[in-house]
A protein has these predicted regions:
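N-terminal Rossmann-like NAD(P)+-binding domain of SDR-like oxidoreductases, especially those catalyzing
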Residues: 1-103, 153, 157, 227, ...
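Short secondary-structure boundary/capping segments
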Residues: 7, 25, 122-123, 169-170
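Short glycine-/acidic-enriched loop or helix-start segments at secondary-structure transitions
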Residues: 26-27, 67-69, 107, 143, ...
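Conserved alpha-helical elements of sugar-nucleotide-dependent glycosyltransferases
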Residues: 41, 117, 187
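Gly/Ser/Thr-rich beta-alpha loop segments that engage phosphate groups in nucleotides
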Residues: 43, 62, 68, 107, ...
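NAD(P)-dependent short-chain dehydrogenase/reductase
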Residues: 72-74, 78, 82-141, 146-157, ...
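C-terminal substrate-binding subdomain of Rossmann-fold SDR/epimerase-dehydratase oxidoreductases
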Residues: 126-243
Length: 243
């Protein structure tokens, strides 16, 4: 309920709605929890923000580009985006969607069902275990460093607050969907190669709901926000794990 947000001591300038049950595979086993958190939870955030017309910046998912009905996670993240659009159109609530592309970086999860492929490889490499690769490893992903993601979110918030403080329209940011991807992708085999061409790997069956490719081709974040990703996945792996 909206009372869940009473912990705020004062009205925030912007709400970053980043909370979600992430990852595709766990959503098959926990569909109710996934819908409650990702869809119902998002509507509650929006309803609370609507009371004071507080801008909401939402963490969307690049998986929304694929088949929205192939797994509960993708469907609920897409529903979250649609809720953002609904509240913006019907109640004129300032909402912005930032789609994330396979986020990685320091202190990422390396254990449990919510860790990413980079986190899994990190754990396996440090433990001297073979890297487990699903399918044939030729599925491709656009990977974005957490620092670049944060930079994109901050640029959104700064644009909104600056425009509001100066009595200007926020329409160039609110109501928009920004893709926070690098515009370059790597196959999972190429990611594994970064840990060493000769490092052992093990191929396992394809998982349900797995997409063949993600790649950011939209330039709106660059054109409107001046956002430009600075980090590269392969360089990150070699710097922090291999060298």
């Amino acid at each position: 309920t909206c009372d869940d947000f009473d912990f705020f001591m004062e009205k925030p300038d912007v709400v970053f709605h980043l909370a979600a049950l992430a990852r595709i595979q766990p959503s098959f086993d926990e569909p109710t929890e996934t819908f409650d958190t990702n869809t119902v939870g998002t509507q509650r955030v929006l309803e609370w923000a609507r009371k004071d017309n507080t801008p909401v910046i939402y963490a969307g998912s690049s998986s929304s580009h694929g088949d929205k009905y192939c797994n509960p996670y993708t469907f609920t993240k897409w529903q979250g985006e649609e809720l953002m659009k609904l509240y913006n159109k019907v109640w004129d609530l300032p909402t912005t969607i930032c789609r994330f592309y396979n986020v990685y970086g320091p202190q990422q999860l390396t254990e449990g069902k919510y860790c990413t492929v980079v986190g899994i490889f990190e754990r396996q490499y440090k433990n001297g275990e073979p890297l487990t690769i699903t399918w044939e490893g030729e599925q491709r992903r656009d990977f974005t460093h957490i620092d670049d993601i944060v930079d994109g979110l901050v640029k959104c918030a700064e644009g909104i607050t600056f425009s509001r403080e100066n009595g200007e329209s926020t329409g160039h940011i609110t109501g928009q969907l920004f893709e926070l991807g690098t515009g370059h992708n790597y196959s999972i085999n190429e990611v594994a190669d970064a840990f060493g061409d000769d490092y052992p790997r093990e191929y396992i069956d394809r998982r349900p709901g797995e997409m063949l490719e993600t790649l950011c081709v939209d330039t709106l974040a660059k054109d409107v926000l001046g956002w430009k990703p600075k980090k590269d996945l392969i360089e990150f792996i070699k710097k922090y794990y291999v060298e």
